[in-house]
Swiss-Prot record:
Record SUPFAM superfamilies: beta-lactamase/transpeptidase-like
Protein name: Probable fimbrial assembly protein FimD, serogroup H1
Keywords tagged on the record: Fimbrium biogenesis
PANTHER family, per database record: BETA-LACTAMASE FAMILY PROTEIN (AFU_ORTHOLOGUE AFUA_5G07500), BETA-LACTAMASE-RELATED
Pfam families for the chain: Beta-lactamase (PF00144)
């Protein structure tokens, strides 16, 4: 009996140690795996407290659920501008799961590449004011030396706007986002004359961060002052609560979720030059409600608007196949509704804005990296289907 008692006692101790020690070991050595395992539980709690403004369209709540379930983001904002009125919904917390600060309509996110919409709008405004033109050669405008690659001399403002200038970040690693390396744009612009392009300008579309940095430099040259100063005057950024990030995080910026981020963690922001190099590329911050209200208030200028585009043929029924001067048009097969969008990403945050030419504006902000990049395309298609249905039932 004593031996039997010892055997049972040993089994109990082993089970007890395993139950306590194994989770502690996993949590300490594999924190992402631990937090990923518990995500479904956290998602269930989060969905029990979705907060929406009065009379918010039902599809905003549907988007929040999609963002929680499929995009793996607990802490989210959705904002919608329709007929001169703002509607919004939020989920989660500013400071992490079950935190002390519920997500609010004015909680601050990084806009990431959604910033480029405003950079484009500022360039189009400068063209409308005849301070720039679509055909302005960037080498001549910036008064740079003759380039070693003669194709660089052909690059125009139009090519930079629509990502057809010859830069391919998949072939040549973007100088804007190399860890712990100061980008040559915009602080050493003469390096453009040393650059070899990845393809002949205007022969293909390839997304480019350096192209939008050069557009920021073009604005500074055209107006004779900093890009931030010109942007503040034109957009009235402070009025809308929109501000530039620096190196590190802003005091009122939300906490981001990196559990599904494959490489970067919270310290990533210290390794990139947000303050001096990324302001025109991905340097703005604010809420989803801030950006839709700012875009709704853009002056109605002519001849160019943020919906302007090159009329060269492209596959509008494929996401990311077409580029306008500010936004990317998408129209699903067998549909007549066109939605224009722009997406942004930094580690721990995904942002999207969607606009149509009827004046509807939607923004979806997620404070988390997605599990798979392809999931972000699914969200954009889902947003299109919901917007298409909502607009056409009115």
């Amino acid at each position: 009996m004593f031996k039997k008692f010892l055997w049972r006692d040993c089994v109990f101790i082993i089970v007890l140690i395993t139950t306590i020690a194994l989770p502690a070991y996993i949590h300490t050595n594999y924190p992402q795996a631990f937090s990923r395992f518990f995500y479904p539980v956290e998602a269930w709690f989060t969905k029990r407290d979705l907060r929406c403004s009065k009379n918010a369209p039902h599809f905003l709540r549907q988007l929040l659920i999609e963002m929680i379930d499929e995009q793996k983001s607990l802490n989210n904002q959705v904002a919608f501008w329709h007929n001169g009125q703002l509607f919004h919904c939020e989920s989660g917390w500013e400071d992490g799961f079950r935190g002390e600060k519920p997500m609010r309509v004015n909680s601050r996110f990084r806009y990431a590449s959604v910033t480029k919409v405003l950079t484009s709008a500022l360039v189009l405004h400068a063209i409308n004011e005849q301070k720039l033109s679509l055909d302005s050669k960037i080498i001549e405008l910036l008064e740079l030396p003759a380039p070693k690659d003669p194709r660089v001399a052909a690059i125009t403002i139009k090519m930079l706007l629509e990502h057809s200038a010859g830069f391919d970040r998949l072939k040549t690693y973007t100088p804007m986002l190399t860890m712990d390396v100061k980008p040559w744009c915009p602080t050493n612009l003469a390096q453009l004359s040393e650059t070899k392009l990845d393809f002949d300008p205007e022969t293909q579309f390839q997304y480019s961060n350096v192209g939008y940095c050069l557009l920021g430099a073009a604005i500074e040259k055209a107006y004779g002052r900093s890009f931030q100063s010109v942007a503040e005057d034109y957009f009235q950024l402070k009025k809308y609560g929109v501000s530039y990030v620096g190196d590190g995080f802003l005091p009122d910026e939300i906490q981001y979720d990196y559990r599904f981020e494959p490489f970067y963690a919270e310290s990533y922001s210290k390794h990139f030059d947000f303050k001096d190099s990324l302001y025109a590329v991905g340097g703005l911050s604010g809420s989803a409600a801030d950006i839709v209200q700012l875009l709704a208030a853009l002056p109605k200028e002519t001849p160019l608007t943020i919906f302007s585009h090159n009329h060269a043929p492209c596959s509008i029924n494929i996401l990311d196949a077409c580029y306008g001067y500010a936004l990317q048009p998408y129209q699903a097969s067998r549909q007549s509704y066109t939605l224009w969008g722009k997406s942004g990403f930094f580690p721990g945050v995904n942002t999207d804005v969607f606009l149509d030419e009827q004046g509807n504006i939607l923004a979806t902000f997620r404070a988390a990296s997605t599990k798979k990049t392809a999931d972000t395309l699914l969200l954009r298609q889902y947003a299109y289907s919901l917007m298409n249905e909502y607009v056409n039932q009115k």
